[in-house]
């Protein structure tokens, strides 16, 4: 079960992929369980600069079932690994039909259904591309710009700070939740709406930040951007030292914080700066 995946597994995987590309691989396919695929794909995207495609895939239904998606997903992933898109992708069914596989950026994907074959979605947009499984040559199309094959130099930065926690705020939750993780090097909070928590949390957050803990605010909303400058609570959170996570998915933000804590002294700046498509451009310019 991929629920048993650890950051050490991500590091071993990144090293193995790096070795294959260094040895001349023109693309890499990673067969992975679906439950934590988005976390592993995000980790590889942050740890590894790649000049070739790295494609994660798996199956929602086992090979002994007539509705298994394993062959189609695997074939489509191989085609994606032969493409010009040198990014970390997730390749899974685009619908319940056996016609197309979607190509999601690993840092923007989320498993949104427990059992459907098209469980994965790109949050906030259509998938980056798709593989037409029914066409004779499994034609691949892309909807948006991407990093082209050969544009990046192969580079590996596998260090991770594993003492990072993800805390979900809910109405009535007290700051005791933070006390349970106050020894962590970093904390990602899933706040409400634009990135809010109860005002009772703010003093404790400030104490943690003053003690050296990096705290990143994300939103429980599936789409949209954190903005803590709109309401008093948000401004107080910024004054307390919270880092806005822009529109990163909470799980992706946790993985990025793990990477940033281990690889840079400017954690806040690195969190706010896009690295692997995890933060998208604003649809409306902000002055």
Model-assigned labels for residue ranges:
Residues 50-53, 86, 208-214:
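A short helix->loop->beta-strand "cap" motif at the edges of active sites that frequently abuts
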């Amino acid at each position: 079960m991929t629920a048993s995946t650890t950051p050490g597994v991500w590091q071993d995987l990144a090293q193995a992929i790096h070795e294959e590309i260094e040895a001349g691989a023109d693309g890499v396919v990673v067969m992975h369980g679906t439950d934590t695929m988005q976390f592993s794909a995000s980790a590889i995207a942050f740890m590894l600069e790649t000049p070739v495609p790295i494609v994660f895939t798996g199956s929602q239904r086992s090979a002994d079932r007539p509705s298994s998606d394993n062959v189609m997903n695997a074939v489509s992933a191989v085609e994606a690994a032969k493409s010009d898109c040198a990014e970390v992708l997730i390749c899974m069914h685009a619908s319940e039909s056996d016609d197309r596989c979607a190509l999601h950026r690993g840092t923007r994907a989320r498993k949104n259904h427990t059992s459907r074959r098209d469980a994965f979605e790109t949050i906030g947009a259509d998938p980056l591309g798709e593989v037409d499984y029914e066409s004779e040559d499994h034609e691949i199309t892309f909807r948006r710009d991407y990093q082209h094959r050969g544009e990046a130099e192969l580079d590996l930065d596998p260090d991770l700070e594993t003492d990072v926690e993800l805390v979900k705020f809910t109405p009535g939750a007290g700051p005791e939740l933070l006390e349970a993780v106050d020894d962590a090097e970093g904390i990602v909070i899933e706040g409400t709406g634009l990135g809010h928590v109860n005002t009772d949390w703010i003093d404790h957050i400030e104490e943690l930040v003053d003690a050296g803990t990096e705290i990143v605010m994300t939103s429980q909303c599936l789409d949209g951007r954190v903005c803590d400058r709109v309401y008093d609570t948000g401004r107080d959170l910024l004054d307390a030292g919270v880092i806005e996570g822009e529109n990163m998915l909470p799980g992706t933000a946790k993985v990025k914080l793990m990477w940033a804590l281990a690889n840079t002294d400017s954690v806040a700046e690195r969190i706010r700066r896009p690295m692997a498509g995890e933060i998208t451009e604003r649809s409306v310019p902000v002055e």
